Amino acid sequence: MNESVRYAWFGIVAIFLVLIGAASYIQVIGAEDLRTHEANTRELYKQFGGPRGPILVAGEPIAESVPSDSTSFNYQRVYNQPELYSGLTGFYSLNYGQTGLEQRLNEWLSGTSDDLFVERLRQNLTGEENPGASVELTLDPAAQEAAYDLIPEGVQGSVVVTEIDTGRVLAMTSRPSYDTNQLAVHSTTEASENMDALVESGVSPYMNQPTADTAQPGSTFKLIDAIAMLESGEYDTDTVMDVPNSLDLPQADVPITNFGGGACAQRNSAEFTWVFAQSCNTPFSQAAMDMGQEPILDVAERFGFNDDSITIPLSVEASYFPDEELHDATLAQSVLGQVDVQASALQMNMIAAGIANDGTVMNPQLVDSVRGPDMNLLEEPQPEVYSEAISEETASQMTQMMTQTVEAGTAAAAQSSVPIAAKTGTAEIGTEDKVNSWITGFAPIDDPQVAVTLVYRNVDYSVGHRLTVDNIGTIVEAVVEQ
């Protein structure tokens, strides 16, 4: 063989090997990247028109794929009782992709999870469709409906109910809500028009309010303050404190005041439990300036503030207490749940639940179990401890003060057939006569089972206070006594 022929032969072999290698890479190594690439519209249309695992509550589907009459897609994603669950399920849309649990649980629902690999091989051999896995949620349908009914039409609000010793979410809902079916339609034009209408009406279809919408928590943040005070060793439940009606702040023109005309204006001094139950501002602000910022920040972070890693598995917007050094005047306002302090409804629920659970905070959990198409159990999340936030003794002291808040304090109207321990909060939001109204607590007091948090945004003070203190008893009775 002459030299030129030999070189040509080597070149042909090299080209052949390169082609074999490239084909192997595409077929084996790069196949998944190509399949899931955002430009692969064929795969997108295939997935959107295919079956998808259901999301279940008490065994009944709240999201499911049903056969479609469409000539383009074989299946339609359908949401049942969508207003109750839209913030949780999110939507599965050809226009807007996936949100909520549809997005967070996509590998299970679409059947692409590694745990379903053998099932996919079997389906490929038999030619069957991949129906995905089914996901059962922890929600109690009666509790979810009762919680939703506590938010009046036209009011922005959130309700969270969790099981204290496990962290299981029994109810999580909010208003304004919307019909997720409007965004799951096959027509991209119709879906776009529906999205525009939702946004114009003030609905945020990408947000689950109880986990993602943070707001100033007002005096519910005094739960954190009170724990820091008890842990300091300078206070116990009977410590007598000054209760001035006005507290001047260093380098500030506006003093801290107590609620005008309330019980705090009637006494010059009182025991800590009474101060807490009546939610007097000035003693808490003075105590914060005396203790400094660090103890309060430490307690807040033990309960979850400033932690952006919490998932349920929905991602949870981090609640915020400043970790940069604050001047005394700003600290005195911040410990009242004002200024830059922000909290989600779930965060304030974790605080109440942790106190009720002898100081142990559990990771909130929304998924009960995941099962394959053959009903084989694939995953069953177990209760997990988030933190050992406070001692059992401190938790007992906090329970005593929260109980007094309901028996003879700002939450007296929350008394019900099930004994409740709670803390109210009213956050000024800079809009005349409008506030964020909060309550968070647990029940029954002697055998805590559930933690409940309600928040109503941008409401009149009287309306918000009535909604919180009246409704916490309603939801507690609905859950505990059913």
Language-model segments: what does each one mean?
Residues 170-219, 224-457, 464:
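Beta-lactam-recognizing serine transpeptidase/beta-lactamase-like catalytic domain environment
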